[in-house]
Amino acid sequence: MIVNCIDIANNILDKFKSDLEKLKKKKIIPHMAIVKINDDAASDKYVSIKLKKAAELGVKTTLISEGIKTQDDLIKQIHILNNDDSIDGYIIQLPLPKGFDSNVICEHIDVNKDIDGLSSFAISRNLANSNLFHPKPCTANGIIEILKQSNYSIEGKHAVIINRSMIVGKPLIGLFLENNATVTVCHTKTQNLKEMTKTADIVVVAIGKPDFLTKDMVNPNAFVIDAGISVVDGKVVGDAAKDLQEYVKYITPVPNGVGRLTVAMIFKNLMDLVKEKYNERI
């Protein structure tokens, strides 16, 4: 079955809209900043999607894309945003250009303004399943939301993640453990990958290789989350072979799959940051 990720994303955005109407009555309008310094088509597209959705939802936005030439410039800009009370949350658009260390950059992000959930505080609290406030990484948390809104019980399941990035794989470890799953993380050096995926209840693949995950690698009862993105002959495709859609029990589509949830979770995180800032219980 192909999972309807559009409906799941809309459920999250509908909750955002409802909360926003309540905030507006108190004259609170969320303000989000996006810092984009990488001049490439993919980053331009992703930022455009975020700005468009923000405009649709009625969120104030500020795009910062000029005057940042070095890593020190970016760190200074982050500190400005950290101390600007008019900004409720911000995003550092990744990937960064050569000469910028994203790990160093994320060390400077204020957890209370961290929409992407990539600051060191957010990541450590996520892995520790901390009760302290922290935004959860958007793509990883979106994947968990797909499973939950599909009425799929995560508890006790074996989840295999083919990705170890800070955006998908690493935060998913904490989120799956939080939901009482058993987790296996695979990567380019993993041996006997097929043996890992074949026994998995949940397979998350996000490596950017079209048709990488094939029928002989999964069991028919698996829930496949395809978070890979590639362009083939002008079309956006995922990492899962097309015939998996008729083979496995559940699978997310590409496009209109995990990406939809990533965008929706951006605004969920923004709302959570605003609620925390103003101590609003909506």
Curated annotation (Swiss-Prot):
Instruction: Recite the UniProt keywords alphabetically.
Output: Amino-acid biosynthesis, Histidine biosynthesis, Hydrolase, Methionine biosynthesis, Multifunctional enzyme, NADP, One-carbon metabolism, Oxidoreductase, Purine biosynthesis
What is known about what this protein does? Catalyzes the oxidation of 5,10-methylenetetrahydrofolate to 5,10-methenyltetrahydrofolate and then the hydrolysis of 5,10-methenyltetrahydrofolate to 10-formyltetrahydrofolate.
Pfam families given for it?
A: THF_DHG_CYH (PF00763), THF_DHG_CYH_C (PF02882)
Reactions catalysed according to its record: (6R)-5,10-methylene-5,6,7,8-tetrahydrofolate + NADP(+) = (6R)-5,10-methenyltetrahydrofolate + NADPH; (6R)-5,10-methenyltetrahydrofolate + H2O = (6R)-10-formyltetrahydrofolate + H(+)
The answer to whether keyword Cell membrane applies is no
Species of the source: Malacoplasma penetrans (strain HF-2)
Question: What EC number is given for this enzyme?
Answer: 1.5.1.5, 3.5.4.9
Which GO terms fall under molecular function for this chain's record? methenyltetrahydrofolate cyclohydrolase activity; methylenetetrahydrofolate dehydrogenase (NADP+) activity
What is its quaternary makeup? Homodimer.
* Annotated protein name in UniProt: Bifunctional protein FolD
Q: What is the lineage of its organism?
A: Bacteria, Bacillati, Mycoplasmatota, Mycoplasmoidales, Mycoplasmoidaceae
